């Protein structure tokens, strides 16, 4: 963490941001802690394809994911793949931030060589154990869940990482509450500030699901809730790996971190059953020491032919979100499988680049 004397005003961080995961958000968080304003540049589909193979997510989807991260102040689409000092300066940024791994272009040259030569380069720690390449490998190779699963019981060993991700938009002060589901009473894993943000009626919205891959469908649902019901905090319930409706591509820890980085989420309940299978309203009130008056469950339009989601609030749990939860993940998985040969070739190219860059992609354990 930078001291106040070392804080920079405007910083630039760029990348593909494909399969937006906690490796991306951890780099963003570290960068935010170095400056006041963080601008994220997102590479175009064409430049990514040229330099490393086709992305899974479209430029629009990748920009949406970055915009949803609470530590991001601005997003610039179609940023050059090879870092350009003049491009960065156009947006008033003084330094570019990148992880401590080497990133090379199609010719094998360091993408940030010009920034380093100009002494306008800052470095943060690369996140080991997660990458777009790793996630694609899980899907293409049908890696068994037990290889990468994270049980609820080990989350306490990741408390420092979770607490960092539970910070507010400044990357420093507490924000998100995190609770662990136990049958008798909830366990507080991280204390946040949800109660301070309650509206005068002291209501909360609860949405539960697998939350796998954290797709455009998830983001659209959360944004709609926030826009239509301002002032009502959103609590996300997230199922344990073995309790998901279908095998998740991300493990529990990875899915929690995706929720924690999202600016729309105020609190998280880890490992509950589906809301309709337990006294969820009563239980959620227990999480907040009975200071919640009412728990609402959103009802989303289930007509996927309608371009815009429709939403209302109910006093009782329903299954409408599960359809969007599954649909978003399924669309991404189908996209990969339809272009399987392209992505397998991308994997081979990337692994070859890893050897050149001396980057080791580790399986999370």
UniProtKB/Swiss-Prot annotation:
Enzyme type, top EC level: transferase
Transmembrane regions listed in the UniProt entry: none
Catalytic activity: phosphoethanolamine + CTP + H(+) = CDP-ethanolamine + diphosphate
GO cellular component: cytoplasm; cytosol; nucleus
Chain positions covered by the region annotation Disordered: 344-365
The UniProt record lists the keyword Nucleotidyltransferase: yes
Pfam families recorded: CTP_transf_like
Biased composition (Polar residues): 355-365
Record keyword Transcription regulation present: no
Assigned keywords, A-Z: Lipid biosynthesis, Lipid metabolism, Nucleotidyltransferase, Phospholipid biosynthesis, Phospholipid metabolism, Transferase
Pathway entry: Phospholipid metabolism; phosphatidylethanolamine biosynthesis; phosphatidylethanolamine from ethanolamine: step 2/3
Similarity annotation: Belongs to the cytidylyltransferase family.
Name of the featured protein: Probable ethanolamine-phosphate cytidylyltransferase
